[in-house]
Amino acid sequence: MVNANADALGIIFPNSYDEQVPDLVNERLMASIPFASRYRMVDFILSSMVNCGIGNVSIIVRKNYHSLMDHLGSGREWDLARKKGGLNIVPPYSEKKIQVYSGRVEALANVLDFLKWQKEKYVVMADTNIACNFDFKEMLNQHIESGADVTAAYTKQPIPEGVRSSYEKTNYLHYTFSMAGQKISKIFVKLRGTRSQKCIDEYLRDGA
């Protein structure tokens, strides 16, 4: 199959999960937390996108993003210092109202006009809380072949012994571990692929 990633826009949410590591993000965000003394968490997702042929990447920041800007610079290290596409760091304010976003839907609302101007047919969205090398090429090809509106990635990992029989309920989700002794759980890794027009249409319907 022809590499569809050249027709994909990458969107990264660098502040996701900041609230889970408050002591580490007093002066930075999740994406700029050091990893192995040499890298930052954003490096893994950004490099994965670039290595798969995605050359137009937007990082929608919310707060404490100066360290991220210092680290990324113009994007030259990733060959993203371009006149067309390249690396875009989007500030946390929309054109219609001055309000810092609190979630991914509001973050997308801040760049809605930007999305409308993009030429890419597909959008790949990711957080920066996982250190991994991910094959976005395979994911997007599977997305196109399936004809799905949205494709989400997950991984399988063992469930710790102490939580295999636990149940938790929150305002956001319900999940149960190992009612029948199951030892493997499917964990959503917050990587998504969709059509760019679908992304815009869903916001206009539900969020505008």
Regions found by a protein language model. Name each.
Residues 1-208:
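Unchanged
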